[in-house]
Amino acid sequence: MELAQIQVRLRECISQSQYSQRQIAKAIGVSAQTISKYMKQNIFPAPDTLSKLCMLLDVRADYILGLTNEY
């Protein structure tokens, strides 16, 4: 899956969550600016950050990465 498609899924999961970007950033140990970059620029979270993000958002990393369509 291309990075642009991964960003779409990541943006979708973050937007549908009950958390603000600032809350997500604080919970996973990055800046709110970094969350914004994940959503809008060609920047992808490090594996450990992706893991924390998926746990917080209750979504499978396989879904974000496009390996499955199961949320």
Predicted features along the sequence, with ranges:
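DNA major-groove recognition helix of helix-turn-helix/homeodomain DNA-binding modules
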Residues: 48-63
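DNA major-groove recognition helix of helix-turn-helix
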Residues: 39, 57, 65-68
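Recognition helix of helix-turn-helix/homeodomain-like DNA-binding domains
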Residues: 29-44
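Short alpha-helical "recognition helix" segments of helix-turn-helix
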Residues: 24-25, 53
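Short, charged recognition helix plus adjacent turn
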Residues: 1, 18, 65-71
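A short, Lys/Arg-rich alpha-helix, primarily the initiator
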Residues: 1-19
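Key DNA-contact positions within bacterial/archaeal DNA-binding proteins
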Residues: 22, 33, 62
